[in-house]
Regions:
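N-terminal leader/targeting and accessory segments in enzymes
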Residues: 1-48, 52-67, 76-78, 190-193, ...
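ATP-dependent carboxylate-amine ligase catalytic core
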Residues: 18, 22, 26-37, 63-152, ...
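Nucleotide phosphate-binding/pyrophosphate-handling subdomain across enzymes
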Residues: 37-38, 134-137, 145-158, 162-163, ...
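Hydrophobic alpha-helical packing residues
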Residues: 57-62, 127, 346, 373
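Acidic, Mg2+-coordinating active-site environments of NTP-dependent enzymes
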Residues: 110-111, 118, 131-138, 154-242, ...
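Beta-strand->loop->alpha-helix junctions that form or flank phosphate-binding loops
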Residues: 194-195, 207-229, 246-250, 278-284, ...
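C-terminal helical cap/extension that packs against the catalytic core
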Residues: 197-216, 230-231, 299-302, 308, ...
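Glycine/aspartate-rich loop-and-adjacent alpha/beta segment that forms the canonical ThDP
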Residues: 408-424
C-alpha cells in the first residue's frame, strides 16, 4: 500500500456518513490492543475556537518539555496535519503502516465504522507508538457520542465558546448543544469552561456537579487586550503580561485565556508547566487558516469561520485590524449552515463578493450562494473554480483588502491558488 492508497482507504465510501455512538470505536480500538488506555489526554470540545485552543495548549505543553500529541480536524493542506507529535505531522510512511494495521480489523466489523472513527483509531495508535506523554484531543462533533469520547477521564476537559451550530445533530437550543459538549466531562476530572452563555453555563455546571468534577470558568475580567497589529495580538491575562500572540484574530486572546486557565489547572494537578513555558508556547504557536494574513499589502486574509457565531468574531477582527475599510470577499459556505445570518454580518463590510463551490458535497453551489448575497443588495459574481475565484477576487480587490472565508474546507485550495498567483 502507498500513501495514495492509504488515503483512498480512509476516505472510502463505505465509511461515509455520521453515526453517533462509541461502540464501533471501542470495538476497533480493542482489536488494536486499546492504545488509548496507554495515553493521557486533554479533551477539547466546543462550537468555536476548539482548534486554536488545542494548538495553543499543545504548544505550551511542548515548551514545558512534554512529548505532546495533537489531534484536530479538518485539515487545511494535507490530511497528515490532523495527527501531530511535537508539532510534526505524521509521516506518510507511518500513516501507511498504521492503515495497514487497522485495515484487517475495520474490514471485519459488522457495524461498519465511520471515516472519523477510523481516523481516531489511527491517531490513538500513532500517539501510543510515539510514547506521547499527553495528547490534546479535539472533539469532532458534539462530545457525548463523538468517537474521541472513548477515553477515560482526561487530565482536563476544556469547553470552548458555545454557539448555535450542528443543531440537526445536537439539538435546537444552546442547552442541548451544551449538554452534548458536557458529555466529555468524566467522573472527578478537572473542567475548564469558556462560559459567558447563561443557558449553556447552567448545563455545564450541573453536569460538573453530578460528576464531582472541579469546574473553573475563565475570568475574562483579568484579560487586558491591547489591540494588535497585522503580525501579533498583544494582551495581559491574570499576571501573564505583554504576550505577543501570532494568531491575529481579535477573538484569539480569549481563546488564549482559556488555554492558560486550563494549563494552570493542570499545574495544580501535578503537571510541570512553568509560566515561562506558557509564554513561549503562546508566542510560537502556529494555527493556519484562522484569520491568517497571507499577504500584508494589499492584504489577503484567509479565515475559517463557518457559522454565524464564528463569523461575528471574524467581522469584529476585520473592523479592528482594518478600520473603515471595505473588502472583496471570496466565499464558500456549507448548505447546512445558517447562510443568511452569516451573509448579513458580512454585507456591511463588502465592496463585492466572489462565490465558489468548495470541493465537498455539503457546499452550497456558487450560483445559489450568489443569489443569497444579492438579496442583501450586494454585488456578487461566481467563479467556476477556486483558482479562478482567487484570481478574480485579487483583481477586483486592487489595492484594497481581500478576505477568503466561509468554510475551512476550501482553505487549502485558496492558499495554494494564492501562492501560485503571486509567485510570478
Amino acid at each position: 500500500m502507498n500513501y495514495e492508497q492509504a488515503m483512498e482507504y480512509i476516505h472510502a465510501v463505505q465509511w461515509a456518513g455520521h453515526k453517533p455512538g462509541l461502540t464501533r470505536t471501542r470495538t476497533l480500538l480493542a482489536a488494536l490492543g486499546d492504545p488509548h488506555k496507554q495515553l493521557r489526554f486533554v479533551h477539547v470540545a466546543g462550537t468555536n475556537g476548539k482548534g486554536s485552543t488545542a494548538a495553543m495548549m499543545a504548544s505550551c505543553l511542548q515548551a514545558a518539555g512534554y512529548r505532546v500529541g495533537l489531534y484536530t480536524s479538518p485539515f487545511i493542506n494535507r490530511f497528515n496535519e490532523r495527527i501531530q507529535v511535537n508539532g510534526v505531522q505524521i509521516p506518510d510512511e507511518e500513516l501507511v503502516r498504521l492503515v495497514e494495521q487497522i485495515k484487517p480489523a475495520a474490514d471485519t466489523m459488522e457495524d461498519v465504522p465511520t471515516e472519523f472513527e477510523i481516523i481516531t483509531a489511527l491517531g490513538m495508535l500513532y500517539f501510543a507508538q510515539q510514547k506521547c506523554e499527553i495528547v490534546v484531543l479535539e472533539v469532532g462533533l458534539g462530545g457525548t457520542l463523538d468517537s474521541t469520547n472513548v477515553i477515560d477521564a482526561p487530565e482536563c476537559a476544556v469547553i470552548t465558546a458555545l454557539g448555535m451550530d450542528h443543531v440537526k445533530e445536537l439539538g435546537p437550543t444552546l442547552g442541548d448543544i451544551a449538554a452534548a459538549k458536557a458529555g466529555i466531562i468524566k467522573e472527578g476530572c478537572p473542567v475548564v469552561s469558556y462560559g459567558g452563555v447563561p443557558e449553556a453555563d447552567a448545563v455545564i455546571r450541573r453536569v460538573a456537579a453530578e460528576k464531582h468534577a472541579e469546574l473553573t470558568e475563565v475570568d475574562f475580567s483579568r484579560l487586558k487586550y491591547e489591540g494588535g497589529s497585522l503580525d501579533a495580538v498583544e494582551f495581559d491575562f491574570d499576571g501573564l503580561t505583554d504576550v505577543h500572540l501570532p494568531l491575529i484574530g481579535s477573538y484569539q486572546p480569549r481563546n488564549a485565556a482559556l488555554a492558560v486557565t486550563a494549563l494552570r489547572v493542570m499545574r495544580t494537578h501535578g503537571w510541570n508547566i512553568p509560566e515561562s513555558a506558557i509564554r513561549t508556547g503562546l508566542e510560537t504557536v502556529s494555527w493556519p487558516g484562522r484569520f491568517e494574513l497571507l499577504r500584508h499589502a494589499p492584504a489577503f486574509l484567509l479565515d475559517g469561520s463557518h457559522n454565524a457565531h464564528g463569523m461575528r468574531a471574524t467581522v469584529q477582527s476585520l473592523k479592528d485590524r482594518f478600520p473603515g475599510q471595505k473588502f472583496v470577499f471570496l466565499v464558500s459556505i456549507m448548505a447546512d449552515k445558517d447562510v443568511d445570518q452569516m451573509l448579513s454580518l458580512l454585507a456591511p463590510l463588502a465592496v463585492r463578493f466572489v462565490t465558489v463551490t468548495a470541493h465537498t458535497p455539503r457546499a452550497m453551489p456558487a450560483e445559489v450562494l450568489a443569489e443569497h448575497i444579492r438579496a442583501y443588495g450586494c454585488r456578487a459574481e461566481t467563479a467556476d473554480s477556486i483558482e479562478a475565484g482567487v484570481a478574480r477576487a485579487v483583481e477586483l480587490g486592487g489595492e484594497g483588502p481581500v478576505c477568503a472565508l466561509g468554510t475551512l474546507y476550501f482553505s487549502g485550495d485558496v492558499r495554494n491558488a494564492f501562492a501560485e498567483l503571486v509567485k510570478d
